[in-house]
Regions:
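Post-Walker A helix-loop "phosphate-sensing" segment adjacent to the P-loop in P-loop NTPases
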Residues: 71-83
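Intrinsically disordered, low-complexity eukaryotic regions enriched in glycine, serine
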Residues: 31-32, 44, 86, 102-103
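Conserved P-loop NTPase motor cores
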Residues: 52-73, 88-92, 109-212
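P-loop NTPase motor core of the ASCE superfamily
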Residues: 2-9, 40-59, 65, 78, ...
Length: 249
């Protein structure tokens, strides 16, 4: 991260010029998913077609959190017309009464391949043409993105998600497993306890704040198991679970 420091003696002056009163252009693809998501500050950031990354070691709580978000009737449940799941069989086997087991079989994929993702893309495009919202959950399939065709198709979905009315949730065990070209695409980060080296890299690549805040935040958030740090990359706002973290400047 480049840190820009103010140099003593340097000043800027703004000269006000005449300017046009431009009309506001409203994008039809920027609709909210459901007004219930605005009840909480954190879920407000999920109330549009975003990309959310969940990072954490095995048994850290990331899969449980995603499951809870989609199971709770006041959160993500009923927000999407279709939910597609890319998840190896063993990854979801540890959850009792897994809500994703109730998905239609043709919306569950046990491997992420170019052909499978292309099939989902076509179905999402058809639904988007009717104004319907979709969601894809990618769980433990990072290795499959080493395939260049699959990675390119994933990026197409990411870049066009607003027009496709698509939200994407991606679960990984480490930040370093995410391809570098994808790391700046995430709208939201849910970070469970990871190594200090990973946190330093996430902070350096994504967060435009002084590195001195990092030890304080890590100590606060990870003092008990299964807690997560939430970051909205557009606004820079951070949360200790559901409670906002305010930095004293």
């Amino acid at each position: 991260m480049i840190r820009i420091k103010e140099t003593p003696g340097c000043r800027i002056t703004i000269r006000q010029n005449p300017h046009p009163n431009l009309p506001k252009c409203e994008m039809v693809c920027d609709t909210m998913l459901h007004k219930k998501l605005d009840k909480y500050d954190l879920t407000h950031f999920l109330n549009t077609h975003t990309m959310s990354l969940f990072i954490g070691r095995p048994r850290s709580g990331k899969t449980s959190l995603v499951h809870s978000l989609f199971e709770h009737s006041h959160l993500l449940r009923y927000c999407f017309t279709k939910v597609y799941l890319f998840q190896p069989t063993q990854s979801g086997a540890s959850i009792k009464e897994n809500i994703f087991d109730t998905l239609p079989p043709d919306q569950i994929y046990r491997e992420l391949s170019y052909e499978n993702l292309e099939e989902v893309k076509i179905r999402i495009e058809e639904d988007a043409a009717q104004g319907l919202s979709s969601c894809i959950i990618f769980d433990d399939v990072t290795a499959e993105l080493k395939n260049k065709q699959t990675l390119q198709l994933f990026k197409q979905l990411a870049f066009n998600r607003r027009h496709l009315r698509l939200s994407m949730f991606f679960l990984v065990q480490t930040w370093f497993s995410v391809p570098k070209e994808l790391r700046r695409l995430w709208t939201n980060l849910f970070i469970f306890k990871v190594s200090k080296n990973e946190m330093v890299n996430i902070w350096d690549e994504i967060i435009e704040q002084d590195m001195g805040y990092l030890p304080l935040i890590m100590k606060q958030v990870y003092r008990v198991p299964y807690k997560f740090l939430f970051i909205n990359t557009d606004s820079g706002r951070m949360f200790d679970g559901w409670d906002e973290i305010l930095l004293d400047d």
